[in-house]
Amino acid sequence: MIKFALALTLCLAGASLSLAQHNPQWWGNRNTIVHLFEWKWSDIAEECETFLAPRGFAGVQVSPVNENIISSGRPWWERYQPISYKLTTRSGNEEEFADMVRRCNDVGIRIYVDVLLNHMSGDFDGVAVGTAGTEAEPSKKSFPGVPYTAQDFHPSCEITDWNDRFQVQECELVGLKDLNQHSDYVRSKLIEFLDHLIELGVAGFRVDAAKHMASEDLEYIYGSLSNLNIDHGFPHNARPFIFQEVIDHGHETVSREEYNELGAVTEFRFSEEIGKAFRGNNALKWLQSWGTDWGFLKSEQALTFVDNHDNQRDQGAVLNYKSPRQYKMATAFHLAYPYGISRVMSSFAFDDHDTPPPQDAQENIISPEFDEDGVCVNGWICEHRWRQIYAMVGFKNAVRDTELHGWWDNGDNQISFCRGNKGFLAVNNNLYDLSQELNTCLPAGEYCDVTSGSLIDGACTGKSVTVNEHGYGYIHIGSDDFDGVLALHVNAKV
């Protein structure tokens, strides 16, 4: 009986721990993470204070923080080739990182770090020098900055069969030296690295290449981490939020279900299907059942996104900033529909897969600059600063904890729906106008369409809609309108 009680206690403790790792630890009614891809720490700190917090964003995913290899031309992916756990990268040093985390936490913006637990850097001719000046010999699996030696890695082999679990989890992903996470020593180094970031005030981690590590090894590592730092405003006993990169198209030998109890999982099917729909390859009317009926994970387990830093560079259905009208519509739907833990992308311009972030002649990352409307220039795209996107972050906050109802569609690519009696969204992806009296479910009054304008001093700078006592309003979205979406909510009542 004592053994049974102990086993039950341990089981319940494990279940409680994994549930806690699904909690993003957001402030108040905030809901949305933004990935400020390749931004410098000092620029993120300022963005938290001057833009993200005032507009209700919840958190920032930052690029990898630990020292990486220096690759010719400085492609973005060099950040994913670590050679030590020193906190010095092109984004800044440890002092600048700690300052950024503190300043962002102080204004209610949580920081989530993209972490590399699967591997170290790939082969490099001779001695490699990292962003903190550390030397390594990747071809010999020698990384003195940790230190790691060959005994800390799986034997070298190539992934040639993606249906072979051994190859997927113990061979080298695109030649990157594959760490042995079953080793007590390797585990201790990874836990030490993550705990240091927790001490500095981060709220959690995006775990890169999670499917290439055995779930039982990750369970041990996650379970060994410290609680979040109460000095940064986290409650006592709060656990780090974990979201794991697991690419699973539904026929993978290593499946997302092996990881979704440990933390959230990146729902790549969401990205692919929303791209197909808003590119016109699937009618929007079918989105009424969006979510688990489409084979997606449970809402609380799914980290959702229109695109990410990887798949935005691929050919195919995934939308990116280069199709702005469809991208804004897809993002509006993403943030209005009650499914998933939402993340939006903030990119830099690229012409090919390897394009580096905007940099000067000395290959230093440059700070984003803004025009008079606050939109980024000088090579940064900053989708999160597009009015149609940051306004929908405000919409998502306004309608939090409300149900979707009042769905309408024209049998094709015009749709609308309500969120409780607090918000209304309409989308037109047809080649003809949407002009219709629709039920907005809102209290009577005049509302500002937050995608076309802003409510300033009681006046709307864009479209406005008058809602009658029955909740109906006349909705017009022209086929050639700049935006194919219209959004109303109670916090934008004129």
Swiss-Prot record:
SMART domains per the UniProt record, alphabetical: Aamy (SM00642), Aamy_C (SM00632)
Positions annotated to bind chloride: 206, 308, 343
Bound cofactor: record note: Binds 1 Ca(2+) ion per subunit. Binds 1 Cl(-) ion per subunit.
Disulfide bonds: 48-104, 157-171, 376-382, 418-441, 448-460
Cofactor(s) needed: Ca(2+); chloride
Alphabetized InterPro entries for the sequence: A-amylase/branching_C, A-amylase_C, Alpha_amylase, Glyco_hydro_13_cat_dom, Glyco_hydro_b, Glycoside_hydrolase_SF
Signal peptide from the UniProt entry: 1-20
Residues modified to Pyrrolidone carboxylic acid: 21
Residues engaged in binding Ca(2+): 118, 169, 178, 212
Highest taxon of source: Eukaryota
Reaction(s) this enzyme catalyzes, per UniProt: Endohydrolysis of (1->4)-alpha-D-glucosidic linkages in polysaccharides containing three or more (1->4)-alpha-linked D-glucose units
Broad class of the protein's primary localization: secreted
Disulfide bond found in the keyword field: yes
Site feature: Transition state stabilizer: 310
One annotated Gene Ontology cellular component of this protein: extracellular region
One function term, GO molecular function aspect: alpha-amylase activity
Active site: 208 (nucleophile), 245 (proton donor)
The keyword Transcription regulation appears for this protein: no
Subcellular location per the Swiss-Prot or TrEMBL entry: Secreted
Keywords: Calcium, Carbohydrate metabolism, Chloride, Disulfide bond, Glycosidase, Hydrolase, Metal-binding, Pyrrolidone carboxylic acid, Secreted, Signal
Single Gene Ontology BP annotation: carbohydrate metabolic process
Complexes and interactors: Monomer.
Record-stated family: Belongs to the glycosyl hydrolase 13 family.
PANTHER family: ALPHA-AMYLASE
This protein's name: Alpha-amylase-related protein
Annotated organism of origin: Drosophila serrata
